[in-house]
């Protein structure tokens, strides 16, 4: 079981509560899917769950999943971030952090919502984030930079589905 963790937003410390076991199962599944789909010689690197990403002096975020692109200068830039929403604690992820990622021109954001058994896929353009898809039921989770990634929402949410 994971522990509570801290993020810094606008210089303010934000204590995030301990994720539930269903949340952690989804995070583990995401990591396994992405790890298996990353090309062998890719410049993309999957970080451990909730690795702190210092985005500015006053901003450190700890996404559930982060894939960074390494560049020759040794600086890594976020390429894909996924947040698994916690019931009762999703405002920070769905509004505040999503705006931060949009302002930083993050190429891809996945918002995983276990309440509705779907994933919202955002991409960035010149105006910020655009909702590109809402994946549910038999729709597969795919990504152009992860050629081997394909998992239906039905299969992905199976470990937490009730009934």
List where the protein language model places each region.
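Gly/Pro/Ser/Thr-rich low-complexity, intrinsically disordered segments predominantly at protein N-termini
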Residues: 1-163
């Amino acid at each position: 079981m994971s522990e509570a963790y801290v993020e810094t937003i606008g210089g303010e410390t934000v204590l995030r509560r301990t994720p539930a076991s269903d949340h952690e199962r989804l995070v583990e599944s995401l990591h396994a899917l992405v790890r298996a789909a990353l090309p062998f010689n890719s410049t993309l690197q999957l970080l451990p769950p909730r690795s702190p990403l210092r985005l500015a002096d006053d901003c450190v975020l700890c996404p559930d999943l982060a894939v960074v692109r390494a560049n020759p200068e040794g600086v890594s830039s976020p390429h894909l971030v996924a947040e698994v929403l916690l019931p009762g604690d999703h405002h920070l992820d769905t509004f505040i952090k999503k705006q931060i990622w949009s302002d930083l021109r993050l190429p891809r954001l996945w918002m995983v919502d276990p309440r509705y058994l779907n994933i919202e896929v955002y991409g960035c353009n010149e105006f910020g984030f655009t909702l590109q898809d809402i994946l549910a039921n038999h729709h597969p989770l795919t990504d152009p930079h992860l050629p081997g990634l394909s998992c239906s929402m039905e299969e992905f949410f199976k470990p937490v589905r009730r009934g």
